[in-house]
Curated annotation (Swiss-Prot):
Stated family: Belongs to the bacterial AtpI family.
One GO biological process term: proton transmembrane transport
Keywords: Cell membrane, CF(0), Hydrogen ion transport, Ion transport, Membrane, Transmembrane, Transmembrane helix, Transport
InterPro entries, alphabetized: ATP_synth_I, ATP_synth_I_Bacilli
Protein name per Swiss-Prot or TrEMBL: ATP synthase protein I
Main location: membrane
Keyword Cell membrane appears in the UniProt entry: yes
């Protein structure tokens, strides 16, 4: 599971870089609601990545120990997305729904880019 932890921390670092860029955008541009929405969505997306990594670790340990396998936490990730939607709908003067949804998708985009980057890097080393 060390490889999973390394991948997780690499992806967290990328997401934190994006959050820093969004924070700069919030502070220095007139698009405050857009960047605040991106910050909200990406922050919740970061929680989703942490939750997914933790559940995958527990899942792997249960399989290795031949114990009963639990779910991977889809319901908890859906609840986090619903929480973001409730916040956006409660405070429409501060948030927009589209940038929040884009922020929620950020972790999955980072995972895909990270996968292809490391696949390309490993293929380059083996060639």
């Amino acid at each position: 599971m060390g490889n999973l932890q390394a991948m997780f921390w690499r992806q967290v670092r990328y997401i934190l870089y994006l959050l820093a860029i969004y924070t700069l955008g919030f502070g220095f541009t007139p698009y405050k609601t857009v960047f605040l929405s991106l910050i909200l969505g990406t922050s919740i997306s970061l929680l989703m990545v942490w939750n997914l990594t933790w559940k995958i670790e527990k899942f792997g340990q249960a399989v290795a120990a031949r114990k009963k396998v639990r779910t991977l936490g889809t319901l908890s990730r859906l609840a986090l997305a619903a929480l973001a939607a409730v916040i956006v709908l409660t405070y429409p003067q501060y948030f927009h729904i589209v940038p929040t949804v884009l922020g929620l998708m950020t972790s999955y985009i980072v995972i895909i880019i990270d996968f292809f980057f490391h696949k390309w890097k490993n293929d380059k080393l083996q060639a």
